[in-house]
Amino acid sequence: MRTVFVGAQEKPNGVSSYTYNLAAELNRKGFKSSVLSFGSCNKESEYKGILIKQYKCPGGTMTSIPILYWKSLPYIIKHRRSIDIVSYQTTTFSIFPSLIVRMFGMKASTIIHSLAEDSPKHGRKMKCLLRAMMKFSLFFSKTIITVSQTKAREIFDRYGAKCHVVSCGVFLPDNRPLNSDVIERNGIRQNKYFLTIGRVDPIKNLEILIDAFKQHEHGDYQLVIGGDTDTEYGKSIVERASDCKNIIFVGMVSGDAKDMLLKNCTAYCLVSSSEGLPIALLEGMAYGKIPIVSRIPAIQEVLEKHNIGLWSDVKNVKQLSENMKSVETDYDSLKVQGELALKIIKENYTWSQIADQYVELGKEIYNT
């Protein structure tokens, strides 16, 4: 079974890490995979042994993805005899490319990580447009994948479309030395900080996290935020935190710098309003960190049945502040939650296990 994944960004961060790492693990298991991505230039490279063919696509994600889908068609058609499945990483924009792919004898699938219309950054008219686009796309999509049972139910309830589930995953940390000065360079205190890393977007409620941290007497604890703040929302949260020297913005981080931050934090925070299945949370859990989380279905699916997590209602500053204070004052009794978090990852969310899920689904797709 040979899969081409189409639609990743230039760097294997955030949602794109799902694409790159699933492809890499499939390749390691003997199922040839490659990734067609969009970025700032045309080039070919490798990531963990898989081919990455990148196409230059102008503009942001909303323009780059449809351009990539059309630009990549000649390559896909040319190599159709060595491709079994073309997996488009968004459902919207993939209707006609996937129809063309199927006309040339290949199978096609699409994936939904989250529903764009749920983001608070969109106004009412844009949300209506996004819902209409998704409804139209789902009508023509033959095989739809999503990343959690929660999201599958949500899509069915909202659109009447049935989805297969292939969860997100992580690689377990190894014991190799990490080559990064991100801790020293930013004046971060090891094992004395709360961490959140990811897309800086209103749906992540970072302003709530900042307010909760500032609201309680945090002593020498710090709040470290990783992600690109060069956006209107990003600049607003930097300004919001400007009167607190213990809130540190480290920018976008990946590789050893990201691992260094995860390894040395006290607790990992994710207080979003909506998620598909959050890779960022899984990464924190893989390092055995206490999860401080908002009570939303996707996070409940991961944690609630195991009775772990320090929970707050969405946008509830008081509850979140109390949870952060609990970690600071009662860490010794709460650290067992981090140990349980790592156990959950080992039993359910390693990339090896996720790749096995995809292989089973791939066989089903190939035989239909």
Q: Can you describe what each PLM-predicted range is?
A:
Residues 4, 187-204, 210-214, 224:
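Conserved donor-binding/catalytic core segment of Leloir-type glycosyltransferases
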Residues 88-94, 112:
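Short His-centered aromatic/hydrophobic patch
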